[in-house]
Amino acid sequence: MAEFVRAQIFGTTFEITSRYTDLQPVGMGAFGLVCSARDQLTGQPVAVKKIMKPFSTPVLSKRTYRELKLLKHLRHENIISLSDIFISPLEDIYFVTELLGTDLHRLLTSRPLEKQFIQYFLYQILRGLKYVHSAGVVHRDLKPSNILINENCDLKICDFGLARIQDPQMTGYVSTRYYRAPEIMLTWQKYDVEVDIWSAGCIFAEMLEGKPLFPGKDHVNQFSIITELLGTPPDDVIQTICSENTLRFVKSLPKRERQPLANKFKNADPEAVDLLERMLVFDPKKRIRAGEALAHEYLSPYHDPTDEPEAEEKFDWSFNDADLPVDTWKIMMYSEILDFHNIDQGNDAGQVLMEGGVAQAQQNYA
């Protein structure tokens, strides 16, 4: 049997295999706690993310299952990669990934970024998005704190817990407000990969200016700030609004003209402003795509069409509309973990991974 070691981090029990030592807290999110650790097998530093009570509700179980499936499927230099996963005796799930020293949020709050860093970071964000979108996945929650960076300026997008299928019908209220695309606020239901391009544009603007472009205090204020810079949405965009209340609100706003971004970003290169103009477009159908943005003149120092891969196959979203009980999600999760480790479910190693009662669940639903 695997040996598990317990440690208290921020009042939370971290229960991990003895393979990982030197636990240090890195960050706390709504759904998990992240610690740095040393992998005794490889000698490399890693990040260990504890998913809090993943089997407490069907919604949380499904969210965890979705993130696990995505991390297994998405394999790209600019996407965080999964190196290990296990279930502890207390039935918590732990994702182990590579450790990067900082994130873009911390960098932006510490100092202004020089042009070559802005270019290189934006290039890597868009390179990652091109791959993710080609897999049929929308990140939905792209923001500086979800963009990890190491000392070599290598960048990786993380936190796919909110990611969804490319689907004309989607639920609203997902991404952090400052980076949220207007179609999420306006229609709530219908959006696609373009929401990530909007978020990337907001991040690009923040790298140029050193502060958030649209720091809304609430949903209404957020939309108002956007219209102050980009003008009133075109009529054909307004017509796509599903909610009567939202439609009334938008029509009640004073008509505003789009302001030239060059006036706001006076110190930015014309090429940078041009790319930003193409990313921050109200109509998602007219917003530049990741592949097109990579070929923009502003990113020419890094653009290499032979080294900007797309996914070999689409992500399988067949589970996503399933309304299943916790125990069923648990069995599915266990199966995915065994598949990750290439373990036959009948052997002893399989029993090790079933420490937290998953074995009992499988017996119940066999």
Swiss-Prot record:
Listed cofactors: Mg(2+)
GO terms under cellular component: cytoplasm; nucleus
EC number(s) on file: 2.7.11.24
CDD domains, A to Z: STKc_Sty1_Hog1
Subcellular location: Cytoplasm; Nucleus
Modified residues (Phosphothreonine): T171
Positions bound to ATP: V26, G27, M28, G29, A30, F31, G32, L33, V34, K49
Function as written in the Swiss-Prot or TrEMBL entry: Proline-directed serine/threonine-protein kinase involved in a signal transduction pathway that is activated by changes in the osmolarity of the extracellular environment. Controls osmotic regulation of transcription of target genes. Involved in environmental stress response. With mpkC, plays a redundant or cooperative role in the conidial stress resistance. Also plays a supportive role in osmotic stress adaptation when sakA is deficient. Involved in paradoxical growth, the cell wall integrity (CWI) pathway and biofilm formation.
Name of the protein: Mitogen-activated protein kinase sakA
Source organism of the structure: Aspergillus fumigatus (strain ATCC MYA-4609 / CBS 101355 / FGSC A1100 / Af293)
